[in-house]
């Protein structure tokens, strides 16, 4: 499923993501825009691992896809569940990622497109 920007923002807000570990709702929406363009089915292969779903969660550290050597699976989930339309496990795993010392900087797309930028446009016009 490709989520509408505002629909996605509303789901995140309901799930307690606004301000979670100091990350504003607009930053989360910016991150997902640039990682997956709000597409739950997004898959991107890297050398030795793969990124899955709307937040592009990586199989080396966070989920198990059964084909990544020495995978940690810190979110204790199958990567497959990150590709369905239900965002609850994606959100729980994203929360787990930002609890690490690196926080939201774990996402390259956030560092490239959202860090130190005016991200208010990502939730502008959304009824939140």
Swiss-Prot record:
Q: Which PANTHER family match?
A: LYSOZYME C (PTHR11407:SF28)
Q: Which UniProt keywords apply?
A: Antimicrobial, Bacteriolytic enzyme, Digestion, Disulfide bond, Glycosidase, Hydrolase, Secreted
Q: What is its EC number?
A: 3.2.1.17
What family is this protein classified in?
Belongs to the glycosyl hydrolase 22 family.
Q: This chain belongs to which protein, by name?
A: Lysozyme C-1
Q: Does the keyword Secreted apply?
A: yes
* Record CDD domains: LYZ_C (cd16897)
- The protein's organism comes out as Sus scrofa (Pig)
Report which reactions are catalysed by this protein. Hydrolysis of (1->4)-beta-linkages between N-acetylmuramic acid and N-acetyl-D-glucosamine residues in a peptidoglycan and between N-acetyl-D-glucosamine residues in chitodextrins
């Amino acid at each position: 499923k490709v989520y509408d920007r505002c629909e996605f923002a509303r789901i995140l807000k309901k799930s307690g993501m606004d301000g979670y570990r100091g990350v504003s709702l607009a930053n989360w929406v910016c991150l997902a825009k640039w990682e997956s363009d709000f597409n739950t089915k997004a898959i991107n292969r890297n050398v030795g691992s793969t990124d899955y779903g709307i937040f592009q969660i990586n199989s080396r550290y966070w989920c198990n896809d059964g084909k990544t050597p020495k995978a940690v699976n810190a979110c204790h989930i199958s990567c497959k569940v990150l590709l369905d339309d239900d965002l609850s496990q994606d959100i729980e795993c994203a929360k787990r990622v930002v609890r690490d010392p690196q926080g939201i900087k774990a996402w390259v797309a956030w560092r490239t497109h959202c860090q130190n930028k005016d991200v208010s446009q990502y939730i502008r016009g959304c009824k939140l």
